[in-house]
Amino acid sequence: MNNKVSIGLALSGGGHKGLAHAGVLQFLEEQNIQIDVISGTSAGAIVGGLYAVGKKPAEILDFFKSVKLFSWNHLSFSKAGLLDAEKFIDYLDVVFGETKLVDFPKEMYISATDINSGRLKTFSRYTKAKEAIAASSAFPGIFSPVQIEGRLYCDGGILANFPANIIQGRCDFLIGVNLDTQETTVKESKEFSSIKSVVLRAIEIMMKQNVATQDNLCDWCILPLKSTDYSTFETSKDRMDEIFHLGYEAAKKGFETVRKKLIKANKSADYK
């Protein structure tokens, strides 16, 4: 589509719930909506990165299914995390190799938490894609931190789980996909039978506090998940398919309310 406005896509973190992002992308492709610039945190960085280099939504779903996070040989015995982040980088290397963010066909911004300074870091576009994505996805306590240029990084979601502000001024129309549930408060839970469950709960509480204001920055904010029925680390392929479908249906349902807005912003676009 020529002479169109630029469209941005902000993707939040959420572990395997990030497959809802891929479902949204499937719907956007069917509507001939082309994304020009992407920002992603954690799972959003994974999905956004894969899409930015040309992977189709179905291929993104297959990638998630192929990653065996909790395989015994991924365990970390000498690093600060249950799992060795280098093992995840190996998965990413198959797709990205030595590609840098600047080499992507689509403009991509990825954030992580700098453990040394305690501040949010949006990586230079000359950072290797596999390293930036792994750093942004290094869930604290689960994955070991990722070192880039002498600094240690972990999950960007700690400080900014929904990075809409990063590209707000870099596009004309901003679509956001926020995997936070539509519940306004953190749902009470009493099931803490493992270290992993405690860590996940602590991060859930923290992330809940830093996403609300970002929704308002989007011209169209999609909220695929209505409850906490799905885990951050799903292992069932059937449930992964369900999450993908939830993203697709949420985008489909919300599209009618923004169709006119999109057409007005870009009269030359051929939206179905």
Regions found by a protein language model. Name each.
Residues 1-41, 49-272:
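Patatin-like phospholipase
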